[in-house]
């Protein structure tokens, strides 16, 4: 991997003056912490970049102090002319070559800093412990390091970096029917956004809807809540329980109206003789038409909100729901789905003008959450045309044919 260093200057020459000062040569050589293969990128006043290998500049940077002046600091570079900074008690000077003039001629100017904390000050402990970078060698004296903190603004730029190969899985699907796997595309250092079947598409052989990447079946919700093969209850169980208007049967603040009874509390069947046992979970049992129907309740963990509406239950809004409620996206009738304890038409979830699987996907794919076709194996997106080895969508990162390696290169 090749690394380049971009050094940014935060100060500009303010004025020029002749300056002569006698300095004692108390210089320490800076030992580079970077690879000798690194590159120095600098920009001139016209924003033109100049690149030089770091190797030839590793032994031409020095720092020290001015003889006879306490608390002074000198940082010099002779890599390309004489450049550097001389910092005295309350003033700092810079030196650099005059590029427009031939010969060994330099200009010296007073430097102005926006952050006065960087200058030497009475409390040198502040500058040492509050600096973002602290570098020292074991051979250096601690007192000298604390007295002369050095500052540089540096950005590490990655010019060449090997990413994971294209078509490598970066996020596995969480369900077989409604969620899709995402792949590395070889050009980006991060995984693409999650892709899944568009909300309102059928799953579970037409018995449920996909919603937010999951197939929302009543059987799965009941098994997750109380386990042991519990299944979603028949409609007459929901009618019996969700019209009660208490903590075990409700659509929020009150009982459910008949058209919404499948969207309130989750009602399950229980075929075992022993009772349901789960910490903090209260359960009621109702025997309806030879079915044992159960509903559950979890005590509130937080007090009701201020100025909340009147409620004959312990729930005040859709945000109060927990796993004892029917999940949004559950089927509550033909082409109907639950949303916030109301039964609604599923057609409002889908924009068939943007994506209609029977027309846009050539009947070999399904619309995803970006309203693009996700194609079956052997069919190529975006319109699911036959192609060996192809599948997926333009959103999941899968490429055909795969590339073995991909680099991010400067100027690409």
Curated annotation (Swiss-Prot):
Tissues showing expression: Highly expressed in testis.
Transmembrane segments: none
Keyword Protein transport recorded: no
Residue ranges of coiled coil: none
Domain Disintegrin residue range list: 111-199
Pfam family name, one: ADAM_CR
Keywords: EGF-like domain
Gene3D superfamilies: Disintegrin domain
EGF-like domain sequence ranges: 351-385
Function: This is a non catalytic metalloprotease-like protein.
Subunit structure, as described in the record: Interacts with TEX101.
Protein name (database record): Putative disintegrin and metalloproteinase domain-containing protein 5
Organism encoding this protein: Homo sapiens (Human)
Underlying gene: ADAM5
